[in-house]
Design a protein with these regions (language model features):
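C-terminal region of N-terminal signal peptides and the immediate post-cleavage residues
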Residues: 58-82, 86
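Charge-rich, low-complexity terminal tails
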Residues: 54, 63-72, 266-316
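Core segments of small alpha/beta cavity-forming domains
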Residues: 84-140, 211-290
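Long, intrinsically disordered low-complexity tandem-repeat segments
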Residues: 1, 6-41
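Solvent-exposed, non-transmembrane segments of extracytoplasmic/periplasmic domains
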Residues: 120-123, 129-153, 161-167, 173-176, ...
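Surface-exposed, charged secondary-structure patches
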Residues: 139-182, 288-334
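Short beta-strand edge/turn micro-motifs at domain boundaries
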Residues: 67-75, 178-243, 306-314, 324, ...
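Secretory targeting and sorting signals
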Residues: 43-67
Length: 386
């Protein structure tokens, strides 16, 4: 074998080994499967490795509490803490809400049709909407409630909620231009997507007054209560708001139920309701058995702390007057125009019921003493008969 033959054979063997190695190279195989060149795949791998290292470094730096300067350099800031010592509304914003809401309420009660219903839904919510709907429906047979909201062109803003959580509230007072009793209004907003609407309105009971709240710029806090989404135990008050309203509802029942150590002072509204129940029972005694029960509407209770540490408690009771007609008897209901308008029935042979909402506001002392009724209103909202 000549020298030239030896060199040629050696070169051929080297090429064979190189081709064999290339065929077995993992990177080359991967590149072939991805339809990339081997060098391109290597570059991609390097970029991925560098990116992962950078991300890990940033995460470690951001999570280290001592790296304040690094946080600032990277633009990292702690989320701001919720402000619990100021009002979510300015005075001007609250007054604009009152103007918008009262305007819608006025239009809803002074117009008719679908537009009127839409205005009422804009102005009222919950039991407030049930009450005003009943009032509008019975306007032709029922004495008008002390003037419409807009007869008091400048509502007095008494309080707004504190903090930026929910629910939020506004408390306002109006005085009718014809000299009627002042009316307390509670407006609520349950969440960020729902505007403020009137939850309840009630005439003040003479000689009651409303003690001052904290300044409007700081807002007034809700007091914890036994029921409802916003309230838990009534700490710091002479009686828990839920307990107060449940006992008040129980003592107004007919037949009467004795309440020992009532946490509230006797008031003219309760006396009037009980007298009406006794009169109704006497009027139908020979024809039907009459009962009356009162129950607190779930989640209707709002207790707002005042500057003195006392609280103003808002709540709604649902009253049900029931008539069980005795066998062989008929009850003529023509005289009860509201019942006839709601049910279309002028004669009842089996049973009948009337549902009335009672809007009440109490002043509850901070530690000792009895609660005092500040405002009250009742409104028939439904009836049934057979």
């Amino acid at each position: 074998m000549t020298r030239h033959d030896v060199i040629t054979k050696s070169v051929a063997m080297l090429r064979l080994r190189r081709d064999d190695l290339i065929g077995k190279d993992l990177i080359t195989k991967s590149a072939a499967r991805l339809r990339l060149r081997r060098d391109d795949l290597i570059r991609v791998g390097r970029v991925i490795v560098v990116s992962v290292v950078c991300v890990v470094c940033v995460v470690m730096i951001a999570s280290a509490p001592r790296w304040g300067a690094t946080h600032a350099l990277l633009g990292i800031r702690e989320a701001p803490k919720a402000n619990t010592t100021s009002a979510p509304l300015t005075v001007d914003q609250a007054k604009r809400i009152l103007a918008r809401t009262f305007t819608a309420a006025y239009l809803g009660e002074t117009t008719s049709g679908a537009a009127a219903q839409a205005q009422l839904r804009t102005a009222y919510t919950g039991e407030g909407l049930r009450g005003v709907s009943g009032r509008v429906k019975l306007a032709s047979v029922q004495l008008a409630v002390s003037a419409s909201l807009l007869l008091a062109p400048h509502p007095k803003l008494l309080a707004v909620s504190r903090g930026f959580g929910f629910p939020r509230f506004i408390i306002a007072q109006t005085v009718a231009s014809d000299g009627g009793l002042p009316i307390l209004h509670l407006l609520v907003s349950p969440d960020a997507a729902t505007p403020y609407r009137i939850s309840m309105s009630a005439e003040m009971v003479p000689p009651a007054t409303v003690e001052p709240f904290d300044r409007l710029s700081s807002g007034s806090p809700l007091v914890t209560n036994g029921t409802g989404p916003q309230l838990t135990n009534g700490t710091g008050l002479a009686v828990a708001p839920a307990t107060l309203l449940n006992l008040y509802a129980a003592q107004m029942a007919f037949p009467a139920k004795a309440i020992s150590k009532a946490p509230f002072v006797a008031d003219s509204f309760a006396v009037q309701v009980r007298a009406g129940a006794a009169g109704a029972a006497g009027a139908v005694a020979s024809q039907a058995t009459y009962t009356q029960v009162h129950a607190v509407v779930p989640s209707s209770v709002y207790a707002v702390r005042q500057a003195s540490g006392d609280a103003l408690v808002f709540g709604v009771l649902e009253r049900t007057d029931s008539f069980a007609v005795k066998p062989g008897e008929n009850v003529n209901t023509v005289a009860n125009k509201a019942f006839v308008l709601l049910t279309g029935k002028k004669l009842v042979t089996k049973a009948a019921s009337i549902t009335t909402l009672e809007f009440v506001v109490f002043a509850v002392p901070r530690s000792t003493g009895q609660a005092t009724l500040v405002a009250a209103r009742e409104q028939i909202v439904a009836g049934s008969g057979s």
